[in-house]
Amino acid sequence: MIWFYRLLYLPGLLLALPYYGLRMWRRGGYGKDFQHRLGRFRRLPSPQAGKKRIWLQAVSVGEVFAISPLIDALQQDESIEIVLTTTTSTGYAEARKRYKDRVFSIGIFPLDFWLFTRTAWKRIQPAAVILTESELWPEHLHQAHKRGIPTFLVNARISDTSFKRYQQIPKLARRLLRKLDHLYAASDLDQARLCQLGVEKARIASTGSIKFDVSIEPRLGEAERTTLRDELGFTSETADTQPFVMLGSSTWPGEEAALLRIQQKAIQAGVDCRLLLVPRHAERGPELIRLLDSQPLAWHQRSQGAGLKNPV
């Protein structure tokens, strides 16, 4: 199976190179530490005697937030050191911001080609591997299995689409899932689906989603809300003149332009409408600046300081 996967992966990787190049150019940020994607992490010292190095992989920003309780739990054992990797550039930035003083090392997960994966394994030298949600990388799991390294899948979930696809290739699905030593399903449904795909009951438990274990920041007080309104330029003289605020959260290309058109129509209809844009990928900042410069409404980037007073 692994040789068949490798034969398919190489041409797929070559075909994807133009896409990666375009993505790096358009979004910026994506090229940061790109050598990690080729398995070329900074060289880590070999684990000291009595230390257990765990390779923890979280795909993107959501998973990076969700693993916080898991990291806290692992750190209760002083013999454990964590190497954290993530797949997306935004996840990498968030991981460095949140965990740089809490884990041993932070990097970007390598592309699942045998040469890159093998290089990463030689540099990280983990004693155990923890994956999150639905990450079943054949080469990564093969390297773990070949070395006799235990692998764990936490918050394991199988979407409707993935479940149907795996059912079409049952033998391959079983062989892939067999390389996971323990699975902790996000729900009873996910557990049932994984069992139908061939996971023995002794290897799986339904533990619920770790995202529910993340502590939520307390609601802002009145003074904090006032400060935030000032920073955004949404200050009003009285409660009666508070603007209508529209939020575009985790937006993708094309969605910001649509929201701007809606805002302009609302203003033309007499509504004091303000728009907050929070792109899913912060690296798209230059692209959004060009878009905002091309339309008539005043705008402000919060990271550049206090907002405009009563912007149009």
What residues fall within each predicted segment?
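Structural motif
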Residues: 150-152, 244-245, 274, 311-312
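A residue-level signal for conserved active-site and pocket-lining positions in enzyme catalytic cores
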Residues: 11, 56, 259
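Nucleotide-activated donor-binding/catalytic signature segment of Leloir-type glycosyltransferases, i.e.
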Residues: 95, 99-108, 289-312
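Membrane-interacting alpha-helical segments
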Residues: 1-8, 12-22
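Active-site and donor-binding regions of nucleotide-sugar-utilizing enzymes
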Residues: 17-214, 218-219, 251-253, 266, ...
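Conserved catalytic-core segment of nucleotide-activated headgroup transferases in glycan assembly
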Residues: 63-77, 223-305
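Short, surface-exposed amphipathic charged segments that create phosphate/polyanion-binding patches used
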Residues: 121-125, 219-226, 290-292, 312
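Short secondary-structure boundary/capping segments
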Residues: 46, 174, 231, 305-306
